[in-house]
C-alpha cells in the first residue's frame, strides 16, 4: 500500500480529542484520517454520551503485518488466512484503517457495532469512513466480516459506497467506467456535489 514509515503518519494519541481512548502512544494513522476520526467520535459522544471507544490498531509496517499473518497461520493450521491480510495487501499498511474495541473501567471488550454503537455504522460516511469488511461482501473482499475495522476513504467516496452498498473493491471497479469527460457525480450527505473519475 505505502512506503515504510510514511511522513504523513502521526500518533493518534498526540492528536486525539478527549472523547475516546487509544491503546498506546505508538498507535498511528495518517493525519487526515485522525482529523476525521476526532470529528466522528466527538459527534458520537454528543449523540450517545459514550466515551468508551478505543482505537486498538492503526498503521502497521509490512514487517508487523507479516508477523500477524504468520501468527494467524500458526493458530489455525491453514495455508492461507481469511482473517489476516497478506503483507503488502493490508489496509493497515495504508495508514487509513483502524480497529475499534470498547474500553471501560480498565476492561477492554469486543466492538460489534450494535446497539447505540450502530450510530457509528450509520454515520461514519459523514466523516469519510466506511465499515470495511462486512458479511455480505465477504466473497468480494476475501476477508471475513470485521465489525471493528474501518477505513478512511473521504466523504464523497464513503457517501457513495454506503448509499449504494458497495465495498471498496466494487467501488474502484465501478470508477474505471468514468473519466474526466464523463465523471461519476456524487452528492455528498451535506448536499455538496463531487465529480469523480478514475
Q: Model segments located where?
A:
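Extracytoplasmic cell-surface/polysaccharide-interacting catalytic and binding patches
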Residues: 1-58, 62-198
